[in-house]
Amino acid sequence: MAVTFSRLFGFAMVVVATLALAGCGGIMPKSSSLRASQSLKSATLTKLKDMGSSPGQAMMIRLFKQTNEFEVWKRTTAGTYKLFKTYEICAYSGTLGPKIKEGDRQAPEGFYNITPGLMNPNSSYYLSFDTGFPNKFDRAYGRTGSDLMVHGDCSSRGCYSMTDEAIAEIYALVRESFAGGNPVVQMQIYPFRMTPQRLAAYSTNPNIGFWQNLKEGYDRFELAKMPPSWDVCEKKYVFDLKREDGSPLEAAAACPPRSNDSLWTALQAKQAADDAVYKTEVAAISSREAKNAAAVQAEAEAKAAAKARGDAMGNFVGGLFGGGQPAPAETPTEAPASGGGAPVPAPAPKGT
């Protein structure tokens, strides 16, 4: 009995020491089975308090591929969300654009809901949680893929990877948000910040229509600092749009009419202003590209003309010094036949 108590006491001391280490600034080793339950650092708790939030408050995540940014936003006592911290994404697979099919090594883009069932405390990449790909939108287009994660270990094959220290804190923040009674953490994944200037730079990209669809959700958050609700109808993302009875929308069916949208007027004004900037930027880019193409063409034509002049001068000079066209060869004259090869005698002089 004494031995058993001693072992239990020793185990408890290890747990306390490990949790204390995590709380003081370190993180548990990958070998620890308790790494998923490690406490938030004291500095993290202080920062949350100073911004008017707490671990149990709701949170939202935004990712930007182009700049490798992973943002965590927390709801404050005012009801709106504030940026808590921006982490650097170690790596993600593929290029800008959504994931289409299993094995394409693309990291997803779009709107995803992280739920407790997507958390993986036993990840071989320190800690991880699933993005929830494919979501309702992805399935409407027949997109395939599985186990698209946010994880540690700083390596990626279709996922978003973070440092172990970063994923330890992010995982704990998500866990505590669930513990506070919030059933979902919304994750918004973008190729870049959805400004009209950035969109204009990719106006010829085949994904431009998809990105412009995502922009409405981006704009709604920028205006209200509240995560928009999202759903899918007519095979596109829609935001803050519900049926009167609150039932889910059908992904390929017609969208219901919009009503009681408090952001609609402000959103329309923002979109109109952004659209004007977008068109101006696209026109400016097209003009620059046309000028560059004309300059390249002019340079190529100038080089060709210079070469032609050089060739002509070379031929002219060569002609002056016999280096032009060669004279036609003379036809050799054959000796007359000798009738067997003996010499023909000269005729005798007349009158002799």
List the predicted regions and their residue ranges:
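Bacterial N-terminal signal peptides that target proteins for export
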Residues: 1-13
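C-terminal motif of bacterial Sec signal peptides marking the signal peptidase cleavage site
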Residues: 20-23
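Bacterial signal peptide processing site
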Residues: 25-28
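N-terminal post-signal-peptidase region of extra-cytosolic proteins
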Residues: 42-60, 72-74, 91-102, 109-115, ...
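Acidic helix-start/capping segments at beta-turn-to-alpha-helix junctions
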Residues: 65-67, 88-94, 187-195
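Short Gly/aromatic-enriched secondary-structure transition segments
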Residues: 76-92
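Exported/periplasmic cell-wall-interacting domains
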Residues: 103-261
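Low-complexity, Gly/Ser/Thr/Pro-rich intrinsically disordered linker/tail segments
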Residues: 195-352
